[in-house]
């Protein structure tokens, strides 16, 4: 049974200031963007000045800016992270997307915390824990079914965010160690080498090659555009588009497409 009234957020990615502005121009209710450091996309960091400009622009149109600071931190980085969080708060950020629970123990400004998909939010128990820990939004694991999402929504009160479009990983977010094992580049430090996107051959126990040179671990991209109504009925509050490394053409076109579909549902 649908719960009325519905307040649904369309959340778009931005690798930089230009992408963020265009996402807002094409219908995003909120935009998520990388912090200067400690984001899960190391190549998508942004300066504090650019984040401040984007916040100012977003707030003109009643849009929100969420800053991703969603990697595992080393102990010697906590003081720098704390200082950066205060700077992001002063720049106008509306929330932080985080992975490391140690952040909750820092001296923080009054800024909402969202639990990143990197915290591996697959179970009702995990979401309840995050809700009780004070998180104001939880990004659910991409792998959950509609029934699983509905159960979590019915038995918690924290707003739930789900991915509706973009890349899929072969592993649970925050739980993949392939890149770190093969190259020393940790996905939990924003440096995933994406070995799952390479071609592999499949060999059985007898050494016989079953498949040769195929992309066996590379999943097709997600597109839940035809299931938005079902997701909303399941209790989702935020629809998230993946793509903090995508260019501006991708961001504005995918945002506009989902804006049109969502408006038709909510009309």
Annotated model-derived regions:
Residues 2-121, 140, 148-238, 245-267:
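Active-site pocket-lining/capping segments in soluble small-molecule metabolic enzymes
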Residues 122-126:
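Short, glycine/polar-rich helix-capping loops at beta-to-alpha or helix-loop-helix junctions
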Residues 132-137, 144:
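Extended, well-folded interaction surfaces typified by the phenylalanyl-tRNA synthetase beta subunit core
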